[in-house]
Amino acid sequence: MADQPNPAPPKPGLKRRWLFVILAMTFLFVLMPFLFWQATWFGKPLNDAQLQKSLVDREHPREIQHALSQVADRMLARDTFTRDSARQFYPQVVQIAQNGQDELRLTAAWVMGQDNSVSDFHQELLRLLQDPNPMVRRNAALGLVRFSDASGLAEIRSMLQPSAIGAHEAGALDERLKPGESINPGTLLGHIRSGDSTSELRSQIPGTIRQWLVPDKAAVTKGQPVLLVDPSVGEMWESLRALYIVGQLEDLPAIENIARGAGEVPANVRQQAELTTTAIRSRQPH
């Protein structure tokens, strides 16, 4: 048998080159989650100068959100010096609540609820009860509870009830999601087609789709309710905690229904409902 030719030896740099490629890819898989974490995590401390700069960075709303979160962290700090250092940024917080985008007004409302000694915060939260965004209104209502102000009681109650989502314009509705699916603020629910144009129907609230109120492909008018959404667990939890303080006798049927475990209610929410029921009853004259 004739000798078979020996295979050509590998090029000297081939193994090393592949090693570098593998190491580089491994590094990227580690690096990318870290960079993403850096971009989305609001815990990175900011000094005073960075906070001042970020709070007015209108081109980067996420920087403003980061700064607002840092102001709240200072407000909640244990030591007096750190808490007092947050006060210099209070005027910017109010300004953002008045002029910011939806996400910024929502965050500002949450921040203002952390210090119930500031009358400007109290007044601004009252104004935000009329905000067009339901999540801003809800955060404002919850924040007012910290001021022992029940002006947002209607909003707090609504967080325990199904919410209707209306069509933002007239046209034919193309439904995208089905009953039972969870949604969050910004979730794409469907499209509305009007002539040659198509617009997106998105949710402003979290929850679970209970039912569509109109058939798929049906013609809808602007403002017409098209979808019914059950509240999210988080919304129910926050509402019950607020009602613990400002709830009234007329709130008991809905709260006791939750305490009995109606629907798929987690144990901690049922427990909070029981505590809230007890607190409301204890405030009634005997």
Set out the residue ranges of the language-model regions:
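Short inter-helical turns and helix N-cap capping residues of alpha-solenoid HEAT/ARM repeat scaffolds
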Residues: E59-H60, G100-Q101, P132-N133, A164, ...
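Hydrophobic membrane-insertion alpha-helices, especially the h-region
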Residues: L19-Q38
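Short hydrophobic beta/alpha edge segments that flank linear recognition/processing sites
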Residues: G180-L201, K217-V233
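Amphipathic alpha-helical scaffolding segments comprising HEAT/armadillo-like alpha-solenoid repeats
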Residues: W41-L55, A77-Q98, S117-Q130, D149-P162, ...
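Conserved hydrophobic register position within alpha-solenoid helical repeats
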Residues: I64-A67, A108, A140-A141, S239, ...
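Core register positions within helices of long alpha-helical scaffolds
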Residues: Q70, V111-Q114, G143-R146, A242-I245, ...
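Short histidine-centered loop motifs in beta-beta connectors
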Residues: A167-S182, I209-D216
